[in-house]
Swiss-Prot record:
Gene: y05B
UniProt name for this protein: Uncharacterized 31.7 kDa protein in nrdC-mobD intergenic region
Length: 275
């Protein structure tokens, strides 16, 4: 998530430098006090809230929701810089987590998996199988998009089929989800939030509810148009901290295995020589 935080922080700092002394301050002491006002500006938090919303939506395609102005008021007089106050407020309302989830989904099957790890591009059928296998992660990302929280699921799943929350069924060349967990009332909503980001990224197409041609209680998933598919991302994506060095670990494990194999061969030859 550190990559996303750095990207958002850069956007916020640029916005602060652009707006701080012009559109974000209010002169309340009259014309004679402009000099005092320059070094002790009164911030218009409502305008800051509006502009930050617009900038995040433009740069990251994420609506950060409500509460930014309230959290900015709480840090008034804290001695923090305005950009740090905004970043802290974004974190408090779950916006950073929401942006992180959106970036992971946008990069899915474009060289990366649902955890931000490197992954070869999958065919559509392979991708559906991967989404089913990693449905807990998919639902967690959808839950983050809803409220910026990572732990909204009140159930546990594992890799056994009967404990999965949903399953894909086929309809010709398309797939649909009809069976849903009764313990997870927001599951359909969270799935649609995740699928909406995947749709915007050109990864898949879907329809749900009244728009679904096979019934209102389903989500239909089908192949995207070739023209809507996007290129591989050129910027790094967030990776879980315990997986940052997984590729290096795999590489060194293979190197160790090869060395052990060579050592065993040498010992066998040396033993034959002694005999």
């Amino acid at each position: 998530m550190s990559v996303v935080i750095n990207n958002v922080n850069a956007v916020i700092k640029s916005l602060v430098n652009k707006k701080m002394m012009n559109e974000w301050t209010v002169l309340r002491r009259g014309e004679p006090d402009k000099f005092f006002h320059r070094f002790n500006p009164t911030l218009d938090l409502n305008v800051i809230d509006r502009d930050v919303h617009a900038e995040i939506l433009d740069k990251f395609k994420v609506d950060i929701g409500f509460g930014l102005e309230k959290h900015l008021q709480r840090t008034n007089g804290s001695g923090m810089s305005l950009s740090n106050r905004i970043m802290k407020a974004l974190n408090k309302i779950g916006a950073l987590s929401r942006i992180n989830a959106s970036e992971i989904l946008r990069n899915y099957n474009k060289g990366y998996d649902l955890y931000g790890r490197l992954m070869p591009k999958l065919s559509f059928d392979q991708m559906i199988a991967d989404l089913w296998e990693n449905q807990r992660r998919l639902l967690a990302l959808g839950a983050r998009l809803a409220k910026g929280l990572d732990k909204q699921m009140i159930f546990k799943t594992n890799n056994t089929e009967d404990l999965k929350c949903f399953k894909f069924s086929t309809r010709g060349d398309d797939y649909y989800i009809r069976a849903r967990s009764t313990d997870y009332v927001n599951m359909g909503h969270h799935l649609c939030l995740a699928f909406e980001v995947l749709k915007e990224a050109g990864t898949l197409e879907y329809s749900s509810g009244a728009k679904c041609p096979i019934g209102s209680n389903c989500i239909l998933i089908y192949r995207p148009n070739e023209s809507s598919s996007t290129k591989l991302p050129t910027k790094p994506v967030p990776v879980r901290s315990n997986e940052k060095h997984s590729e290096q670990i795999d590489y060194f494990n293979k190197q160790i295995e090869e060395l052990i194999f060579l050592f065993n061969n040498m010992m066998m030859k040396f033993s034959d020589y002694l005999d």
